Amino acid sequence: MEVAEANSPTEEEEEEEEEGEETISEPRPHTRSNPEGAEDRALGAQASVGSRSEGEGEAATADGGAASVPGAGPKPWQVPASASEVQIRTPRVNCPEKVIICLDLSEEMSVPKLESFNGSRTNALNVSQKMVEMFVRTKHKIDKSHEFALVVVNDDSAWLSGLTSDPRELCSCLYDLETASCSTFNLEGLFSLIQQKTELPVTENVQTIPPPYVVRTILVYSRPPCQPQFSLTEPMKKMFQCPYFFFDIVYIHNGTEEKEEDMSWKDMFAFMGSLDTKGASYKYEVALAGPALELHNCMAKLLAHPLQRPCQTHASYSLLEEDEEAGEEEATV
């Protein structure tokens, strides 16, 4: 008489386990609600879909140092290499913005080199004034709780229009401006002024609690490459590391490089970009001899909310399928 072991499974139990394994491994049918097994593929892809801190753009690069130009030696105005990038995940919400627009008034802004829409030549100041007004009025239509301030930059910075949610108040100060010859660029004074006039919000949990507002500085800058007056103090370092502070740049340059100069416009652009320790700000450069349309395009790209936009290296503005396919081909090479 054969006695079955108490711990050994019976044939019926083995068959049930085999059927269960087949059921788990069997993919869902390709129905209209699940074309080509898209939902099954999405399950595996969800693990790779992350936020800004999980591999988007500059914030998750392995080269966590400050941006520098290849082959260039260390310069005293460069951010120290020890300033590592801060990877922070924040809720992607459309909270109110406090936008501080800093407009350069150096004499280079009055040189008529930009090509306007009708083919004539215009200067960068006129184009910047128009694009700033369009930006402010458009942001106001998106969310009437956004606030705007205007700062003009000469040798020093002046707070021209306080934070206001009325676009007309800022625009009334925008056009009565004159350029001047500037010998230096006091970048440290600009950030000190911003710190005095604004207060960065604080939340109990950065990753889950939306902030009451964010502070964004947009610098429209155009002058020959020069060594800025700047030293990264501890308060400034905290400001740049704050997840609710953003420093966007529109740099208008002459497009040429003089061999006799100590630094080129590329050095200056790289230095300004290196101030962003989170990889969350947007930086654009436009040649002074190019079309004015490029400036308008850059300002239009800055309309996106800084908490909701991707890192700049992941941003795509193409609408045609051809451009999208071309972009995919480039990414797979």
Swiss-Prot record:
Q: Would you kindly state one Gene Ontology biological process term found in this protein's UniProt entry?
A: DNA repair-dependent chromatin remodeling
- This protein's source sits in the domain of life called Eukaryota
What residue spans carry the Low complexity bias annotation?
58-67
One GO cellular component this record assigns the protein to is: BRCA1-A complex
Question: Which positions does the record annotate as the modified residue N-acetylmethionine?
Answer: M1
Q: Which residues carry this modification: Phosphoserine?
A: S8, S33, S53
Query: Region entry Disordered: which residue ranges?
Result: 1-85
Annotated membrane-spanning segments are none
> Where is this gene product found?
Cytoplasm; Nucleus
Q: What GO molecular function annotation could you give as one example from this UniProt entry?
A: identical protein binding
What does this chain do?
Answer: Component of the BRCA1-A complex, a complex that specifically recognizes 'Lys-63'-linked ubiquitinated histones H2A and H2AX at DNA lesions sites, leading to target the BRCA1-BARD1 heterodimer to sites of DNA damage at double-strand breaks (DSBs). The BRCA1-A complex also possesses deubiquitinase activity that specifically removes 'Lys-63'-linked ubiquitin on histones H2A and H2AX. In the BRCA1-A complex, it is required for the complex integrity and its localization at DSBs.
The entry describes its oligomerization and partners as: Component of the ARISC complex, at least composed of UIMC1/RAP80, ABRAXAS1, BRCC3/BRCC36, BABAM2 and BABAM1/NBA1. Component of the BRCA1-A complex, at least composed of BRCA1, BARD1, UIMC1/RAP80, ABRAXAS1, BRCC3/BRCC36, BABAM2 and BABAM1/NBA1. In the BRCA1-A complex, interacts directly with ABRAXAS1 and BABAM2. Component of the BRISC complex, at least composed of ABRAXAS2, BRCC3/BRCC36, BABAM2 and BABAM1/NBA1. Identified in a complex with SHMT2 and the other subunits of the BRISC complex.
Q: What is known of its domains?
A: The VWFA-like region is similar to the VWFA domain. Its presence reveals similarities between the structure of the 19S proteasome and the BRCA1-A complexes.
Return the protein name: BRISC and BRCA1-A complex member 1
